[in-house]
């Protein structure tokens, strides 16, 4: 046999807190099977922190002071306190749990107007919302926005445009547009892009469209560093195949109201977790951890991890809990993401010495390379192609 990564490194940080080491801080090298986008690499560095005897407010304050100090020292900019919004508010206003708060173009909820419209495409939808572009978009531009909407899960895109004398767009042929115009506060020569569907997915589609409006019309300044805390994430998310699963990870502490009742109302249970975002990019994520063995076992059991499996995978941690665990929590921040955003770079590879390319290879030395057969023989390993 040979070792594999069975569980999160978070367990190791928790063990440090349980053993009496009340503060942990490390620039941790991470290897992860990431999809290779501009803000991701398979090898990266996290600023990793864990603290004992803390509440959520303590972690937020320590992290914020560190980031503000770093910005002051590196850029000479003095930042004020970071605003805080809840997960629900972030989706409701920005269509994202990592919102770019540098510009407006916030989502407008049109669900009530849609329900009263009599148009079955929208009046039966769980949610109908819109964003307003302060431009009279061309047909080809609207087609571009529709392609983006469909790429991220929408069935289609509706729109309304207000001209000098009339309101146009496919929706205008089926509904009384006046309630929509009033709710949108749609001015002359503006275009409203409208999405209907399941609430969260429709909000997230609008969030993507909002960022396209930002980029198309250059609504932001890269020198404006708008940090924001997002708090009160759901503890669980529903999965059609696996049922209720942790939205973050199963070691996250439920909110105080639902510590004893999360199984009865999982969809309403929030977590003591938090993310730090900058200009629409997630910089880091953290939480207050579970510190009670019975609660941890109950959470694992709720998501389908039985007692035997729990002991096999997490027995060392569950046993450590029994010796008395302090309340503890922490956060991990992506160092390269922070450096890229603070220096105005669009790709984290621009702030890395030896980044991987789009095929996850190091162009400098060609790694990773094929393993020499003699090395495999020495270790007693055999590599198969996955089809046998």
Across the structure, where does each feature detected by a protein language model lie?
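Class II aminoacyl-tRNA synthetase catalytic cores and aaRS-like
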Residues: 1, 5-388
């Amino acid at each position: 046999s040979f070792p594999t990564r069975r569980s999160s490194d978070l367990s190791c940080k928790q063990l440090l807190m349980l053993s009496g080491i009340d503060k942990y801080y490390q620039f941790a090298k991470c290897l992860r099977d990431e999809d290779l986008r501009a803000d991701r690499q398979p090898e990266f560095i996290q600023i990793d922190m864990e603290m004992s005897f803390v509440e959520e407010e303590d972690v937020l304050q320590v992290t914020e002071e560190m980031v503000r100090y770093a910005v002051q020292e590196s850029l000479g900019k003095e930042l004020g306190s970071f605003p805080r919004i809840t997960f629900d508010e972030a989706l409701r206003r920005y269509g994202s749990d990592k919102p770019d708060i540098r510009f407006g173009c916030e989502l407008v909820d049109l669900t009530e107007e849609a329900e009263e419209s009599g148009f079955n495409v929208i009046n039966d939808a769980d949610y109908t919302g819109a964003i307003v572009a302060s431009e009279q978009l061309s047909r080809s531009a609207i087609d571009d926005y529709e392609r983006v909407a469909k790429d991220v899960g929408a069935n289609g895109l509706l729109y309304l445009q207000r001209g000098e004398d009339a309101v146009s767009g496919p929706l205008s042929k089926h509904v009384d547009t006046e309630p929509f115009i009033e709710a949108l506060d749609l001015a002359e020569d503006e275009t409203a892009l409208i999405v209907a569907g399941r609430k969260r997915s429709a909000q997230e589609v609008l969030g993507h469209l909002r960022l396209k409006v930002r980029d198309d019309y250059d609504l932001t300044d890269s020198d404006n560093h708008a940090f924001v805390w997002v708090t009160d994430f759901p503890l669980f998310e529903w999965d059609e195949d696996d049922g209720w699963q942790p939205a973050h990870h199963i070691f996250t502490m439920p909110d105080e109201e639902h510590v004893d009742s999360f199984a009865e109302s999982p969809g309403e249970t929030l977590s003591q977790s938090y993310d730090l975002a900058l200009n629409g990019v997630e910089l880091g994520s953290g939480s207050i951890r579970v510190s009670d063995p019975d609660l941890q076992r109950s959470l694992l059991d709720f998501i389908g991890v039985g007692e035997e499996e729990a002991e096999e995978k997490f027995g060392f941690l569950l046993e450590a809990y029994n010796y008395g665990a302090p309340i503890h929590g922490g956060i991990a921040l992506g160092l390269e993401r922070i450096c890229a955003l603070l220096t105005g770079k669009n790709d984290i590879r621009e702030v890395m010495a030896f980044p991987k390319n789009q095929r996850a290879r190091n162009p400098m030395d060609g790694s990773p390379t094929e393993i020499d057969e003699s090395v495999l023989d020495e270790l007693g390993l055999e590599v198969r192609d996955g089809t046998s």
